[in-house]
Amino acid sequence: MTLEAFADTIIPGVKRFPGDRAIAGVCDDAGSVEAGALELLADPATGVAPALVPLSQMLNGHATAYAEGAGLTLDDDVPPFVALGYDDRATLIAELTAPGNPERDGWVLLCMFSTMAFDTAAHRSTAEAIADGHPGLIQMGFAEPNSDGLWRFPDYGYGRELAKRHPNTTESGSPE
């Protein structure tokens, strides 16, 4: 729940159900959590999976200290970071990712992977993510692949052909 609240602070989303505490619900569209931030963070390829429990515990410790410093009373029904309101979550994350914070690298990694889950669906096949309606790719207007699952763009990105096709290029786009 703590890492969901963290990811939701980076790219906020709509609450999944009325009593959803992890998702602050500060926007009307799906955010990082619905886009798969937790799946990406837990993927062994990221290298952060073994650190997720310690980072979550540290984040809750920082949330408790932040709340005490701000004179806030936290609800004991949820983890301390989840109990913070969105603005307080964002302020705390800004402090944790500030230059000079000795823990900065860990928090920046969580921010990056939360963003990547939304912006790129890095934990999924892009074609499958689009077919499944991945919220980040859809919101950004990412083009659907052709019927064979490949992307081809008949119009050049800069309005002109940048280079002639190499004579040894195969139909799949690979050199011979």
PLM feature segments, named:
Residues 1-3, 7-124:
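Flexible, low-complexity segments enriched for small/polar residues
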Residues 100-176:
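Long, amphipathic alpha-helical surface segments
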